[in-house]
Amino acid sequence: IETEQFLFACRGSFNSSITDNILFLTEGNLLELDSPKVAKKVYYLMIEGLQNITRHQYHDDSGSPFDGALFIINRREQAYSITYGNWVSAAVKEDLEKNLAAIVSKDVVELKEYYMEILNNSGFSSKGGAGLGLVDMARKSSGKLSFEFAPVNGGFFYYLNLNIAIDKEEYDEEVASDYI
C-alpha cells in the first residue's frame, strides 16, 4: 500500500498574497522531505500552476473573483501530486480542452518542439502570458498531465493534475497517475 502525505490544500479566491503564503508555507516542507533538485522542480511547478489560477481566475460581472479555485499538493512514495482547479466558462473550456488535449498527445521531443514554436511565434496575451505555462508544466512533470471538466453553474470546473517523480529510476507512471 502506497503511503501518502497531505502537504497543503487551499480552496477559495486566489491572489498574489495568498499564492506567496502557500509557497512560503510549503517550501520548507519540500526541502525537509526531498533533495534540493526534487524540491526545486516541485516548487517551480507550484509557482506555474498557482500563477495560472491567479491570472485566469474567473471574475463575475461585478468584478469579484470566483471563490472556489483549488490547489492541493500530496507526497506519495514515488511522486508528488499537484492538483489545480478553477471555474471556466463554456467558451474558455472549449479552447482550454483543445490546448490540453494537444499537449497531452505529444511525447517529450514533440513537447520541446511545441514549446520552441510557441516561444518563437507568439506574442503576449491580454493576461500577460505567451501560452507557455501548460506546455512547460507538461515538460517538467513526470508523465502526462491529466485533466477533467465537470459541469457546474452554467460553466465548468476544471481539474488539472500532474506528478513529479521523486526517483526517476523507481517511478511507475501507472501507480502515480491514479488520482483524478
List the predicted regions and their residue ranges.
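Short N-terminal amphipathic alpha-helices
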Residues: K37-Y43, T54-D61
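Conserved short strand/loop->alpha-helix "switch" segment adjacent to the catalytic nucleotide/phosphoryl-transfer site
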Residues: L25-I47, N120-K127
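STAS-typified acidic loop motif
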Residues: F6-D20
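A generic structural signal for ordered alpha-helices
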Residues: I1-E4, D20, E27-G28, E32, ...
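Conserved small-residue-rich
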Residues: F8, G28, Y179-I180
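Conserved beta-strand-loop-beta-strand hairpin that lines the nucleotide-binding pocket
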Residues: I1-F8, R55-V175
